[in-house]
Structure formats: C-alpha cells, structure tokens
C-alpha cells in the first residue's frame, strides 16, 4: 500500500505541462499490459520524443511488442530509432523500424508489399506444411537510397578512438514511488 502523498507524486508524472519529462523503459516492458498502459498514459500526458534503442528488437511485424511500440509511437510528437547492428543482415527487418518512425517513410501499405519489392520468396515444404522463405533480396540499391533520406549512419572507425569497455555494476536504490512504478510494470 502507498500513502496519499506517494500516490500524489505518482499522479504528478502525468500532469500536462511544458517541462521536459524523461521516462526510460526497457523495451521488454512493452510486451506487458501494465508496461503498455503506463507508457501510454505518460505519452498522452506530455509532448514527447520516443526513442527505441537497439531498434532491431521491433523488427518482427507480427510480434506483440512491435505492434504495441508502433501503436504507442503515434502518441509521441517525435520518434527516433538507434541500433549498433548493421542493417545488411536482413533488409526486411527495416520495415517495422521505419513504420515506427512514420508509416509513410517507405511508401508501402503493408509489410507484404514491402517484402515483395525487396525479396524474392520461395515456398518450402516442411513436415506437411508450406512456408514462404526469402530466396534472395532485390532492389537493395533503391532501398539504400530511400533510407539515406531519413537516416544517419556512423561507423565505429569514423568515431574518435574509443577506450576499452569498462563494465561497472551499479546498484541503485529506488525511492518508494519509483519502486511502486517498477513493481507495477513487472
């Protein structure tokens, strides 16, 4: 149970004002009903920039998390994605990441239209089932040109010399209000 004062502090997170508010959530929280509900309430209470780090976590167009994040992104004034992974592994992974940014960026009405433009599919038969798999990719120069209009890529060698990674575990004590919010999203 929380006190009236603690409840008021929690509710103050959702007061509409012009000050910058930052909410950091693990992308996994968007797979839960509580996480989606909390993020939705926050996004609808503030002028926000919603950024997805490691945006390849939203590459699957049928995943619940991907659908939730794309839907919530519509409530954010600004959207950004970031990833350290090269996009050359599977160009089809770009569709939902771009859809999160703006559903009109790639000018396709569906994932399947996008897939038909940039991949040749073949049918494989497996244990009495037929499945569609990518045979080869196509029109990648065109896709690359399209991406240049709204993306920015920095290679590791283009950056300053980076020191070796230094891993430090930090234990953070949450306030009662923070712990309550954290527990609600579990």
Describe each region flagged by the PLM.
Residues 37-38, 43-48, 57-72:
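Substrate-gripping "pore-loop 1 plus following alpha2 helix"
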Residues 149-186:
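Inter-lobe connector of SF1/SF2 helicase motors
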Residues 6-22, 27-46:
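Conserved helix/coil segment N-terminal to the catalytic DExD/H
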Residues 20-22, 49, 79, 169:
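Residue-level preference for the first positions of well-ordered beta-strands
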Residues 6-7, 32-33, 60, 88-93, ...:
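Switch/connector loops and helix/strand junctions flanking conserved nucleotide-binding motifs
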Residues 7, 48-49, 66-156:
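Conserved P-loop NTPase motor "coupling/switch" region that bridges the ATPase
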Residues 3, 29-31, 85-89, 119, ...:
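Conserved nucleotide-binding/hydrolysis micro-motifs of P-loop NTPases
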């Amino acid at each position: 149970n929380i006190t009236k004062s603690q409840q008021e502090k929690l509710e103050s997170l959702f007061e509409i004002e012009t000050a910058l508010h930052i909410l950091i959530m693990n992308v996994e929280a968007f797979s839960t009903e509580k996480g989606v509900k909390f993020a939705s309430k926050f996004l609808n209470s503030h002028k926000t920039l919603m950024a997805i780090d490691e945006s390849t976590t939203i590459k699957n167009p049928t995943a619940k998390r991907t659908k939730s994040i794309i839907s919530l992104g519509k409530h954010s004034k600004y959207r950004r994605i970031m990833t350290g992974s090269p996009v050359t592994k599977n160009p089809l992974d770009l569709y939902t990441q771009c859809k999160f940014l703006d559903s009109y960026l790639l000018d396709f009405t569906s994932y399947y239209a996008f897939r038909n433009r940039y991949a040749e599919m073949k049918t494989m038969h497996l244990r009495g089932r037929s499945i569609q798999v990518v045979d080869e990719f196509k029109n990648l120069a065109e896709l690359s040109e399209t991406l240049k209009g709204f993306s920015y890529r920095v290679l590791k060698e283009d950056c300053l010399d980076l020191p070796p990674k230094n891993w430090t575990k930090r234990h953070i004590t949450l306030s009662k209000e923070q712990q309550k919010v954290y527990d609600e999203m579990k």
